[in-house]
């Protein structure tokens, strides 16, 4: 697979800090940003809207092939996600959508249908690709790969805080159970399991600040892409 622009992949489980770090790096470098998890959330939401069963692989793959989705970068304000002309940035962050996204992502035909869309985001001047298999499947030849992780307890707490801030009514114990269940499902699925790429820098974000993680990431990027001016 040829690459038209430099790519930095950032993989890891939910709540490890991928989204925050990816947005900071994209802003710092002036690069495009791909939130791969959002694509699966959008597909899950589209399935719900169109009454497609989450265990119907064929129908989900067909829906994915014709998915009308746009990602609009808003400087300093994250990413605006648009599905069929509607801003769904808030809707796709619900816990229901999060769990549904993990389920639809387990189907090989669904992943294949969305693979081309993800790779199309690789454009100049560069791309920060945030996901779960960016470095292992989608952009395996990228020289700069990161894998962020954190304890299940800390990731559940981060998710709890995030959902509370957005006005969702959530239970921390239930969230922790869902984090553990999702980890088990994602790490043991037969297609594109959640594992670090062999050449990825693994960063455990438990108990460390955002600035420190960003500096570790930038140092790795500079090492792997020495021609970049950071």
Swiss-Prot record:
ATP binds at residues 12-20. HAMAP family: Cytidyl_kinase_type1. GO terms for molecular function: ATP binding; CMP kinase activity; dCMP kinase activity. Its EC number is 2.7.4.25. The keyword Acetylation does not apply. It catalyses: CMP + ATP = CDP + ADP; dCMP + ATP = dCDP + ADP. Gene3D superfamilies: P-loop containing nucleotide triphosphate hydrolases. One of its GO terms (biological process) is pyrimidine nucleotide metabolic process. Belongs to the cytidylate kinase family. Type 1 subfamily. It is found in: Cytoplasm. This is Cytidylate kinase. One of its GO terms (cellular component) is cytosol. The gene is cmk. NCBIfam families: cmk (TIGR00017). Pfam families: Cytidylate_kin. Keywords: ATP-binding, Cytoplasm, Kinase, Nucleotide-binding, Transferase.
């Amino acid at each position: 697979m040829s690459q038209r622009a430099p790519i930095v992949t950032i993989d890891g489980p939910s709540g490890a800090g991928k989204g925050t770090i990816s947005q900071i790096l994209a802003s710092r470098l002036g690069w495009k940003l791909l939130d791969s998890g959002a694509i699966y959330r959008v597909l899950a939401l589209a399935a719900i809207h169109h009454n497609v069963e989450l265990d119907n692989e064929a129908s989900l793959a067909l829906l994915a092939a014709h998915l009308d989705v746009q990602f609009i970068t808003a400087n300093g304000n994250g990413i605006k996600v648009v599905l069929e002309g509607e801003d769904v940035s808030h809707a796709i962050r619900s816990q229901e959508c999060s769990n549904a996204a993990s389920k639809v992502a387990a189907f090989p035909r669904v992943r294949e249908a969305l693979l081309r869309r993800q790779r199309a985001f690789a454009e100049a001047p560069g791309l920060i690709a945030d996901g779960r298999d960016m470095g292992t499947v989608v952009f395996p030849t990228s020289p700069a790969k990161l894998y962020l992780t954190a304890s299940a307890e800390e990731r559940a707490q981060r998710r709890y805080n995030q959902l509370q801030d957005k006005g969702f009514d959530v239970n921390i114990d239930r969230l922790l159970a869902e984090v553990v269940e999702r980890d088990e499902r994602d790490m043991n699925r037969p297609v594109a399991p959640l594992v670090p790429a062999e050449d990825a820098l693994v960063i455990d974000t438990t108990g460390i600040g955002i600035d420190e993680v960003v500096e570790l990431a930038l140092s790795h990027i500079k090492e792997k892409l020495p021609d970049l001016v950071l």
